[in-house]
Amino acid sequence: DRRQYTLLRKQFDDRPIASHQLVQEKLAWMITEITKGQLLAIQCGRLKDQGKLEPAHVSMLKKNNVEIALEVARKSRDLLGGNGIMEEYPIMRHLCNLETVKTYEGTDHIHTLVI
């Protein structure tokens, strides 16, 4: 949704906001962080398969991926502008869900202590 929106939304001399470097940087950051989180999850899966997964690994995974998911959702909301808080786009629901996940999966403070 966010990428498509940035391609369609026009601003400043009737150019899509996706053509602006600040928007491109946010999109690049988001996909990079999402990919890093996926790689971390894959590595933890491999460690589990090998019987080498430790609680600290799980805490690193949860702490990192929940924080990144929250930041990606916030940046996505920013890219959507005023529409980011409208029901038409589900980003606010995702943000609320992620805040819940941050709590029930253990706060980052608890995970830091485990690590």
Predicted regions and their residues:
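Alpha-helical interface subdomain recognition
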Residues: D1-I115
